[in-house]
């Protein structure tokens, strides 16, 4: 129960700090709807494996894990935004609330796409030869793959 409560509080924090500063009426509503969907999908990443159909389980897990990555980036972006606003406050800089609120979902979305692309690419293979002194003759030429 604690993890879901913490997840709910963090979603509420993001919504409370970002949504009111978004322009128009549709943008904040869309952002809050996305947060509600995120709150529903993240547990699906962990509960998806309980599905009897493997394809269904994979879909729920994919959706949940992708949403978890986006949520993580949203949280970090929101915290960084709050830090920027806090540091800018004493200097009476031009209003930063609206532009930084727009930057939060944009940065989070781009970072999530970058992370997804990096996770889906084929890993490079590196061949490294390491000489080990005192190695028994039976192990000469032995290959370790990691």
What are these regions (language model features)?
Residues 120-126, 131-146:
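Membrane-embedded segments
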């Amino acid at each position: 129960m604690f993890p879901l409560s913490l997840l709910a509080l963090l979603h509420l924090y993001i919504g409370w700090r970002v949504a009111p500063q978004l322009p128009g009426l549709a943008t904040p509503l869309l952002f809050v709807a996305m947060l509600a969907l995120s709150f529903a999908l993240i547990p699906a990443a962990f509960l998806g494996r309980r599905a009897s159909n493997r394809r269904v389980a994979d879909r729920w897990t994919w959706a949940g894990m992708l949403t978890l990555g986006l949520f993580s980036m949203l949280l970090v972006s929101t915290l960084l935004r709050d830090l920027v606003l806090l540091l800018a406050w004493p200097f009476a800089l031009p209003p930063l609330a609206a532009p930084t609120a727009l930057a939060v979902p944009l940065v989070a979305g781009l970072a999530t796409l970058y992370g997804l692309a990096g996770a889906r690419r084929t890993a490079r293979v590196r061949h490294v030869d390491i000489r080990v002194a005192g190695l028994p003759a039976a192990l000469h030429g032995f290959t370790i793959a990691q």
